Amino acid sequence: MKVYCGYIGEEHLEKNVILNGWVKKVRKMGNLVFVDLKDRFGIVQIFATKSDGVFNELTQLSREDVINVEGLVLLRKNPNNDLKTGRFEIHVKKILIYSKAKTPPLIIEDETDANEEIRFRYRYLDLRRDVNLKIFELRSKVYQAFRNYLYSQDFIETETPILAKPTPEGARDFYVPTRTRKFYALPQSPQTFKQLLMVAGFQKYFQITKCFRDEDLRSDRQPEFTQVDIELSFADEIEIQTLIENLLKYVFKQTINVDLTTPFMRMSYEQAINDYGSDKPDLRFDLKIKTLNTYFENSKTLFFQKALLNNQSIRAILVPNINLNKKQVQTLEKFAKDKGAKGLSWISIKDEKIIDGSLLSIQEDHIIYKTIFKDFNLSTGSILLVADTFDIASQALGLVRINLASILNLKKPNIFKFVWIIDWPLYEYDNEAQRFVAAHHPFTMPTLETLNTFDVNKKDARGRSYDIVLNGYELGGGSVRIIDQQIQRRMFKSINMSDEEANLKFGFLLTAFEYGVPPHCGIALGLDRLMMILVNSEYIRDVVAFPKNNNGVDMMLDAPSNMNDEDLKELGLKIKND
């Protein structure tokens, strides 16, 4: 009978079995040869004696050879308790060598000797490692759990086109030239398609789909990524948020056996920026940001005086019971400067005595720092300060906060802190373009309070948007959609899109609004980011089977690559060298 290597058990004793797998280790011991044979499901020991006809073939095997063997299952004289199959071994009678393997360029074990470039160039070998196989087994279970729950709630799974038109989603599009001298764009999201499915009467739609964004890459980004896309008719924010909470509760229970507590916390965008300096706060630890302007009204420190004179903010993180050192603060200061801060000031206190810091020289201000610590009930600890505009100080300390938590080991991997970020601005100001742009996308419905003035008073306009954040990562975002053609046209005009341009780009959607549109809302959940968190990885490429590196390059395929002149000519394209 054919059996997987990892499934050999008591029921197979004294029976002939057929196994297939990869050779992991060959050990010749006198008149015996032992081979560790592995498949996806586990590893088992096989052996032959010198008198067996297969002895020589087994001794000549190499690591990663792919073989088929037939033999008798026996109890091992010296069991290996570290293996699930460690009580058994197979006495081989027949062997078929499917394929011989060269010496691999990396050690195919959980702990490998290869750097990332080698691992990704030979990704098919890297994926043989158990640590990677387990990631993709879990990923498969996550897919199944999402589908099972949404099917149970009467959702229709529907594919939408990959070859589409450009959309104003905030990142650059990938374009696909055609032989007709026209271009498709790969979708940054199925946004307009899923809204049209609501017009079509689907009411409950989802798909697990690929999306594409030609943007700067980070550890949690890939140019192509997978999202669970959901849209729901005759529903509002509360209904879809409740749906997503129940969905994630089911997925976590089914995949990693974790019971999530619902409902999730809700926090306004303004509160997130005020307290955490980020619209995706990590709530596994405290370290809230405080505004301390009133403490420094009589400060003798020049840059504090200047900040208050210019109506700027003095913001701080208080670190209880920990005395940071100069090296740690210098590391954190680099992150503050990355967000535009001029520097990161600090003071450390122990048993109510100032012991270290960058602000020691001005003795008159020591009473200020002692008062701050006293008011926050701290006799020992550190304080990190940034004096700048409110936005710069908040963003700088937000990034400092995240990296401080890493230094202090506060990011516990098995704690899952969800939060809904709500009450979003409808627009954000693009300093480079010198104008307001849609904060999420231009299909978001303004709040009732700002509906009449959203396109005039853009700074105060609010949208019916919501992001779901998990452990400092934006897991997903969504909104209640505009369903009125006139409101949609106002929104387009407010982001400098003329009626002519709107008709050219979105005429199909505007026309659909003339034929009866149900109120609807939706969300897209980043499946890759969810997988990052589930397996406690810092890099999205660890949970993608064939990822791109930080430069957007597929090391295995050497893609993107140049096109030959003949193909360019057929498409009517010419590459212009800078």
Curated annotation (Swiss-Prot):
Q: Which InterPro entries match?
A: Aa-tRNA-synt_II, aa-tRNA-synth_II, aa-tRNA-synth_II/BPL/LPL, Asp-tRNA-ligase_1, Asp-tRNA-ligase_1_N, Asp/Asn-tRNA-synth_IIb, AspRS_core, GAD-like_sf
EC number in record: 6.1.1.12
Q: What is its main location?
A: cytoplasm
Region Aspartate, annotated ranges: 191-194
UniProt cross-references to PROSITE patterns, sorted A to Z: AA_TRNA_LIGASE_II
Q: Which UniProt keywords apply?
A: Aminoacyl-tRNA synthetase, ATP-binding, Cytoplasm, Ligase, Nucleotide-binding, Protein biosynthesis
Tell me which residues bind L-aspartate. Answer: E169, R213, H440, R481
Cite a GO CC annotation.
cytoplasm
The signal peptide annotation in the UniProt record is none
Record-listed ATP binding positions: R213, D214, E215, Q222, E474, G526, L527, D528, R529
Domain of life, per UniProt, equals Bacteria
A GO molecular function annotation here is: ATP binding
Q: Where in the cell is it found?
A: Cytoplasm
Which terms under GO biological process does the entry name?
aspartyl-tRNA aminoacylation
Q: Which Gene3D superfamilies match?
A: Bira Bifunctional Protein, Domain 2, GAD-like domain, Nucleic acid-binding proteins
Any one Pfam family match given in the protein's UniProt record, by short name = tRNA-synt_2
Q: What catalytic activity is recorded?
A: tRNA(Asp) + L-aspartate + ATP = L-aspartyl-tRNA(Asp) + AMP + diphosphate
Query: What family is reported?
Result: Belongs to the class-II aminoacyl-tRNA synthetase family. Type 1 subfamily.
* Quaternary structure annotation from Swiss-Prot or TrEMBL: Homodimer.
What this chain does, per the entry, is described as: Catalyzes the attachment of L-aspartate to tRNA(Asp) in a two-step reaction: L-aspartate is first activated by ATP to form Asp-AMP and then transferred to the acceptor end of tRNA(Asp).
The record's listing under HAMAP family reads: Asp_tRNA_synth_type1
Name this protein carries in UniProt: Aspartate--tRNA ligase
Which species is this UniProt entry from? Answer: Ureaplasma parvum serovar 3 (strain ATCC 700970)
Top-level taxonomy:
Bacteria, Bacillati, Mycoplasmatota, Mycoplasmoidales, Mycoplasmoidaceae
